[in-house]
């Protein structure tokens, strides 16, 4: 008769399995995949086209755009997208999503810089034109003066100014960092 030690007696079949994933960890992974799916649904079609996705997943995301949010059908569809995301490698999608979202924030930051330049030009006039032309020699001083003068006149009449928009477009097209 062989005596079995306590450790052998209470040993479970999964104790030696190195690839064992607990239910809690599996649920966390599923929820993370569903959150990535929700982020994908929030993207526009052009942004979504920049991310390489499985055809079935892409079609499901497009269908989610057609369903009204805050409905039971939308919630079920989001769970379905989460289910599809579990069968796809999520890491490359997360990386592509970060690139798309970061590119948008970089574009917004650039536009804000041009907006501030325009505001300084309109408030300070010739001194700011001189500073900008020294900093960016590709700018045409005469064109800047004309646009600033017209925009200042139009802003005195009303808040929306065609020349102010032209000044913004000119700065954006000429200054490319």
UniProtKB/Swiss-Prot annotation:
Disulfide bonds: none
Location(s) in or outside the cell: Cytoplasm
Keywords: Cytoplasm, Ribosome biogenesis, RNA-binding, rRNA-binding
GO biological process, alphabetically ordered: assembly of large subunit precursor of preribosome
Disordered as annotated region, ranges: 1-26
UniProt GO molecular function: ribosome binding; rRNA binding
UniProt-listed Gene3D superfamilies: PSPTO4464-like domains
One GO CC term on file: cytosol
Domain of life: Bacteria
Pfam families given in the database record: DarP
Family under the similarity heading: Belongs to the DarP family.
Biological role stated in the UniProt entry: Member of a network of 50S ribosomal subunit biogenesis factors which assembles along the 30S-50S interface, preventing incorrect 23S rRNA structures from forming. Promotes peptidyl transferase center (PTC) maturation.
PANTHER family: UPF0307 PROTEIN YJGA
Cited NCBIfam families: PRK05255.1-1
Name the UniProt record assigns to this protein: Dual-action ribosomal maturation protein DarP
Gene for this chain: darP
